[in-house]
Amino acid sequence: MKLHELKAAEGSRKVRNRVGRGTSSGNGKTSGRGQKGQKARSGGGVRLGFEGGQTPLFRRIPKRGFTNINTKEYALVNLDQLNVFDDGTEVTPAILKDAGIVRAEKSGVKVLGNGELTKKLTVKAAKFSKSAEAAIIAKGGSIEVI
């Protein structure tokens, strides 16, 4: 076999359907859009959720709840992510951001207890879960709420 003899596998390449090229093509005249009407026009069609003038579902269903403007969103860090630091390192939100562990500090950093901590660290964060707090102290490290 030579390079010029290479061919695509049978059925792997489908020929593009060219519409409006004569009635015998099967997609001539109206090009598969049916007769007149909104959907036959260029740019035609209805917006998402439109139900033909009937009150749409999202307006028939009552509103519920509200968004609390005072909610705090914390950047979450798990224990196993802290293993990138050397023993005895003081881990602060700024250091976590520099290391690429958190993208933005948001309302502060919360340390969660997923994974296993293998280093002795001093961790400074806004919040700690009970399991994270216990694991850090068990490794001889310390925590500080800031």
Swiss-Prot record:
Single GO MF descriptor: structural constituent of ribosome
KW Ribosomal protein (keyword) present: yes
GO cellular component terms listed in the entry, alphabetical order: cytosolic large ribosomal subunit
Keyword Ribonucleoprotein part of the UniProt annotation: yes
Keywords for the protein's UniProt record, in alphabetical order: Ribonucleoprotein, Ribosomal protein, RNA-binding, rRNA-binding
Gly residues bias: start-end ranges: 23-35, 42-51
GO biological process, one term: translation
Compositionally biased spans, kind Basic and acidic residues: 1-13
Pfam families reported in the protein's UniProt record: Ribosomal_L27A
Region (Disordered) residue spans: 1-51
Record-linked NCBIfam families: rplO_bact
Stated role: Binds to the 23S rRNA.
Family per similarity comment: Belongs to the universal ribosomal protein uL15 family.
Quaternary data: Part of the 50S ribosomal subunit.
Protein name: Large ribosomal subunit protein uL15
Organism lineage: Bacteria, Bacillati, Bacillota, Bacilli, Lactobacillales
Name of the gene this protein is made from: rplO
